[in-house]
């Protein structure tokens, strides 16, 4: 059976995350968005985004990486300004899907 492999990174907000000002959070968020924009441009991330209204509010986001190893996905995740500030705690795992399964677009929303 032919499959495509991604590395799924779950981003958890630790209970003991550092306290930051609104300005610091805004700066980190801008860097976070730029980091993932760049990873998508480099074809290292297939897609990523926030997670809301789930059973565990500490799960804040996820990313599907196109890397050769879990270690590489983790390294790219930890290069994110938010991760360097110890806001998300990443968990990396394999994710397999049928070839071409990720080509369908999602439903458009406006936030």
Identify the residue ranges that each predicted region occupies.
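Conserved, structured core segments of small domains
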Residues: 1-111
């Amino acid at each position: 059976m032919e499959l495509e492999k991604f590395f799924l990174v779950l981003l958890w907000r630790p209970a003991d995350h550092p306290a930051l000002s609104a300005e610091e959070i805004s700066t980190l968020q801008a860097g976070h968005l730029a980091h993932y924009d760049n990873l998508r441009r480099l074809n290292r991330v297939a897609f990523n985004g926030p997670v809301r209204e789930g059973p565990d509010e500490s799960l804040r986001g996820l990313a599907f990486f196109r890397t050769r190893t879990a270690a590489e996905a983790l390294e790219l995740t930890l290069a994110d300004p938010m991760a360097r500030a110890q806001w998300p705690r990443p968990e990396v795992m394999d994710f397999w899907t049928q070839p071409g399964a990720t080509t369908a677009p999602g439903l458009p929303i406006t936030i």
